[in-house]
């Protein structure tokens, strides 16, 4: 018999730095899940990623108080800010430009995110990420 799904929990946790403090502890604790078990499993799963990068995770909680989780790739906005060397996007992206990214940097970001993108090919994926960059106030070169 299949386990009954109780709920889905969506969080953004820094890679390799999951601990029982908020947001992980309260989100799992109120559903009766083992917090330390998740922290150890998540940290092991994200050990190959750069420590500190926010990593989206979707936790499936079952009615018997067990869980499974799936990690996604780091959000494009975080990768774009890192590539451009800025701390935040522009408040007025069409008038104030805060940084520059090259096509090569966009292709590297697409390689990181390719599992989560729905684009048909590399060119379409690069255009998608370039649109995100422009909406943050970054200039796309190349």
Curated annotation (Swiss-Prot):
GO terms for biological process: translation. The gene is rplK. It comes from the Bacteria. GO terms for molecular function: large ribosomal subunit rRNA binding; structural constituent of ribosome. Pfam families: Ribosomal_L11, Ribosomal_L11_N. One or more lysine residues are methylated. CDD domains: Ribosomal_L11. NCBIfam families: L11_bact. Keywords: Methylation, Ribonucleoprotein, Ribosomal protein, RNA-binding, rRNA-binding. PANTHER family: 60S RIBOSOMAL PROTEIN L12 (PTHR11661), LARGE RIBOSOMAL SUBUNIT PROTEIN UL11M (PTHR11661:SF1). Belongs to the universal ribosomal protein uL11 family. It comes from Xanthomonas oryzae pv. oryzae (strain KACC10331 / KXO85). Forms part of the ribosomal stalk which helps the ribosome interact with GTP-bound translation factors. The keyword rRNA-binding applies. GO terms for cellular component: cytosolic large ribosomal subunit. Part of the ribosomal stalk of the 50S ribosomal subunit. Interacts with L10 and the large rRNA to form the base of the stalk. L10 forms an elongated spine to which L12 dimers bind in a sequential fashion forming a multimeric L10(L12)X complex. This is Large ribosomal subunit protein uL11.
């Amino acid at each position: 018999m299949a386990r009954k799904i109780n709920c889905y929990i969506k969080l953004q946790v820094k890679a390799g730095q999951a601990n029982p403090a908020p947001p992980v502890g309260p989100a799992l604790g109120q559903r009766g899940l083992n917090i330390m078990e998740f922290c150890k499993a998540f940290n092991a799963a994200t050990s190959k990623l750069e420590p500190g990068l926010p990593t989206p995770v979707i936790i499936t909680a079952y009615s018997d108080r067990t869980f499974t989780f799936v990690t996604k790739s780091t959000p494009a906005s975080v990768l774009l800010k890192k590539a451009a060397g800025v701390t935040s996007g522009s408040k007025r992206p069409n008038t104030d430009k805060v940084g520059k990214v090259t096509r090569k940097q966009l292709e590297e970001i697409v390689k990181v995110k390719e599992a989560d993108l729905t684009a048909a090919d590399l060119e379409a994926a690069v255009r998608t990420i370039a649109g995100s960059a422009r909406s943050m106030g970054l200039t796309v070169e190349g």
